Amino acid sequence: MDQKNGSSFTGFILLGFSDRPQLELVLFVVLLIFYIFTLLGNKTIIVLSHLDPHLHTPMYFFFSNLSFLDLCYTTGIVPQLLVNLRGADKSISYGGCVVQLYISLGLGSTECVLLGVMVFDRYAAVCRPLHYTVVMHPCLYVLMASTSWVIGFANSLLQTVLILLLTLCGRNKLEHFLCEVPPLLKLACVDTTMNESELFFVSVIILLVPVALIIFSYSQIVRAVMRIKLATGQRKVFGTCGSHLTVVSLFYGTAIYAYLQPGNNYSQDQGKFISLFYTIITPMINPLIYTLRNKDVKGALKKVLWKNYDSR
């Protein structure tokens, strides 16, 4: 990212929500609470999945991966955002912006792929219960999770390098609360059609392919559940599927809005509010929806708490 006159940027100013000073205080309090709950919820899942042998299953392996991912994702964004919301200095160094772009995009892309991979585990458990242990072999689910991380950070590396190659017009004010590809493209003083086309193509793969897999898998799960005679069993599965789909829709829907629309239609003002959903809100909701309401997790939590209490 070089200026048109050949000199290099020393940093950027993250304008964020500075045009709404009254909103900044409200956002600071709300986002701080969200961040605390995100830390507590996701750390709980990781610790319980490690400590309780009953949770050493493919499903909880994926859940602990998702929790670790969300923990890193929010920690790479929220502290900087909180400082900017309450401080006068809203700048971020050039290096800091590059690192934030690479890490946040890598983790976000990984989550897109991982959520698509995770639904295969649910599909195998509901639609192929007799073959589940054979299908979800440890080598397979470790490979699936690892592939998600590799794809996510490979995409991030590509996008970061392409952004670094852009020539900027001397403007260093970013209409966002973090360094993200769409607002950075707005600072370029060269034609970004190729960048936007490449970003659109890759985003289709990263976003829409997992969405298609999720829709297909859940349609098969619904068909399998409809064969269950017990109404209580149907209600339980439909309730779980419904809550999962709600979170998935929120995450993918907002990410699709940010990355799969033409650059000339992209509203930076709307974009930063939309980004709050997939960067902060869904990482907080994920542990509540996927695991903390689960009977196995509640049982594991009680065991750990009682064990600590008895040891005193």
From Swiss-Prot:
Domain of life of the native organism: Eukaryota
Keyword list, A-Z: Cell membrane, Disulfide bond, G-protein coupled receptor, Glycoprotein, Membrane, Olfaction, Receptor, Sensory transduction, Transducer, Transmembrane, Transmembrane helix
Glycosylation sites per record: 5, 195, 265
Gene3D superfamilies: Rhodopsin 7-helix transmembrane proteins
Bilayer-crossing regions: 26-49, 58-79, 101-120, 140-158, 196-219, 237-259, 273-292
Pfam families: 7tm_4
Disulphide bonds in the chain: 97-189
Localization per record: Cell membrane
Gene Ontology MF annotations: G protein-coupled receptor activity; olfactory receptor activity
Segments in the Cytoplasmic topological domain: 50-57, 121-139, 220-236, 293-312
Keyword Ion transport (UniProt): no
PROSITE patterns: G_PROTEIN_RECEP_F1_2 (PS50262)
Biological process per Gene Ontology, one example term: detection of chemical stimulus involved in sensory perception of smell
Record's keyword annotation contains Disulfide bond: yes
Topology, Extracellular side: 1-25, 80-100, 159-195, 260-272
Record's GO cellular component terms: plasma membrane
Lipid bilayer topology: Multi-pass membrane protein
Family: Belongs to the G-protein coupled receptor 1 family.
Stated role: Odorant receptor.
Protein name as catalogued: Olfactory receptor 2B8
